[in-house]
Every structure is written in C-alpha cells, then in structure tokens.
Curated annotation (Swiss-Prot):
Upper classification of the organism: Eukaryota, Metazoa, Chordata, Craniata, Vertebrata
Descriptive protein name: Phenazine biosynthesis-like domain-containing protein
InterPro entries the UniProt entry points to: Phenazine_PhzF-like
Organism: Rattus norvegicus
Active site: 46
Example of a GO cellular component annotation carried by this entry: cytoplasm
Gene: Pbld
Any one GO molecular-function label of the UniProt entry: identical protein binding
Length: 288
C-alpha cells in the first residue's frame, strides 16, 4: 500500500500554528480498518481521507470528492480543520483547477471555496439550547473547578456542551486556565456529551486585533484532550454568539497553545461561512 499523504496546519497562514491535520489521497477504496490504523499512526487530532467518487475522477480536475475524518481512536461525523487542510492540499499542492470543491461527508455536502486571502468553508450552523446546570455540574466542576460560569448551552446535533465563562474573565484568563480533561469520559458516559467548549466574550479596540469571542475545545471522549483550532465547534459557537451579540459577521480566536483565527459569516440560508488560512508543512508517501 502506497498512499500520498500530507500534513497541513489549518486556520493559520504560518507553519506550526493553527491545527495540524493529516490528509490522505485515496485512488481506490481503502480497506475499512486501515483508515483507523493510519489515523492512529499519524497520531494527530484528525486524519482526513479524500476519495474519488468515480474511477474516472481526477484529484486535479474533479470538483466533488468523498471525505472522512478519523481521530486516533474513532471516526467523527464532522471536522472543520481537516476539511480546511484537505481543501488546501487539493488547491495548493495538487493544483485543482476548480474554484469550489464539494465534499460528500457524514454531515452532508460541505463546500470549500478559494478566497483571495484564504479558504472559505460552507458548513451547517447548529443551534444551542439552555442546559440545566445540575445535570452537568459534576462534569464542569471536574474540568474547571470553581471558575465562575455565566451560561451553559447544549447542541444536540453535535453533542457539544458550551460553557460560557463570566464576562469578568478575559482572553488571558482563558488561555491560562488549567482544564482537567482526564476524568471527563468517566463522569459523562451516557453519550450525550462528546465535546466541551469553553468560551468568553471578546474585547473591542485596544492595541491588539479585536475578536468577538474566544474559545477552547476539549474532546477526550474521542481521544482528543484539547484540540488546537476546531471548525466543528465554531458551527455551534457562531450560532450562540451571533444571538448574544446581534451580529452576523464575527472574528473568533481559539486560545490553544498553537492558536488560530476564523472569520465567520452567517448566511441567509441558515449555514455559516468560516474563512481561514492553511499551510501545508509536509508531503510524502505512506508505505505499509
């Protein structure tokens, strides 16, 4: 087995920032268990597999492909940064001639289009609903201790729990917050929660780039203690903060140690555009 493989850093224009994802190009159907074996070998938060939908398709000429994502332990239904990485590989390395690519995925058809200063992902927008604190208090206590919480929301479509911290906290507090993810899968094992979003309101003005909101994302349930920059979490965050701020256009920053930023635009059709950069940092051949 020989497969072209790449690593691209998504939601950044600078190598070694953003969120790295491995991208495999599949000329033909891959044995099912090989997807997970390769993802485990790559040991990144996600490995993406792009496959041709028809034998006559071409990675440089076709505009529609199949796409799957795997963490080191399981397949996931949606991954933003690995979709961004996949589009970057096709656009920048394979020199795909199309301006827009369509990916057929477990979350339906997702589109990625070229932009002058990056790549725009067309993703679903998922609503949130108020979550009873007492149902998740043990989970939150284990994760962030006595940190003051302002709001708790739940996204049933993505099984993500959104925890908004007090507006008295700023970006530096969120960045330095020690989050204990190890016990979380043992505390919440009903399957209701598969990801924890922590978020704070942004600041305007000042000497630094203004962001509308900041976040961090944790998914120990699928083998990812903390994800550097998470497109799928922003399908939830965009819905929540748009309602809170009364805005359709927002800029977001994910406060992991690598960091990454997204330009967000809520669309009239109920979906969300997320724009970011990507840097391909490795290309080679997987042999097994």
């Amino acid at each position: 087995m020989k497969l072209p493989i790449f690593i691209a850093d998504a939601f950044t224009v600078t190598a070694f920032h953003g969120n790295p994802a491995a991208v495999c190009l599949l000329e033909s159907i891959l044995q099912e268990d090989a997807h997970q074996q390769i993802a485990r070998e790559m040991n990144l938060s996600e490995t993406a597999f792009i496959r041709k939908l028809q034998p006559t398709d071409s990675f440089s000429q076709s505009s529609c492909f199949g796409l799957r994502w795997f963490t080191p332990v399981s397949e996931v239904p949606l991954c933003g940064h690995a979709t961004m990485a996949s589009a970057a590989v096709l656009f920048h390395k394979i020199k795909n001639v199309n301006s827009t690519l369509t990916f057929v995925t477990l979350s339906g058809e997702l589109k990625a289009r070229r932009a002058e200063d990056g790549i725009v992902l067309d993703f679903p927008l998922y609503p949130t609903f108020p979550q009873d604190f007492h149902e998740v208090k043990d989970l939150i206590k284990a994760a962030i201790g006595d940190t003051t919480v302002q709001d708790i929301q739940y996204s049933p479509d993505t099984r993500k729990l959104l925890v908004r911290l007090s507006d008295s906290y700023d970006r530096s507090f969120l960045e330095s917050l020690k989050v204990n993810t190890e016990p979380l899968p043992g505390i919440e094992k009903t399957g209701k929660v598969k990801g924890l979003i922590l978020t704070v309101k942004g600041e305007s003005g000042g000497q630094t780039t203004p962001y509308d909101f900041y976040s961090r994302y944790f998914a120990p349930w699928v083998g990812v203690p903390e994800d550097p920059v998470t497109g799928s979490a922003h399908t939830v965050l965009s819905s929540y903060w748009s309602q809170q701020l009364g805005k359709k256009e927002m800029r977001a920053f994910q406060c992991s140690c690598r960091g990454g930023e997204l330009d967000i635009s809520l669309r009239p059709d109920g979906r969300v555009d997320m724009k970011g950069g990507a840097a391909v940092v490795l290309e080679g051949m997987l042999t097994a």
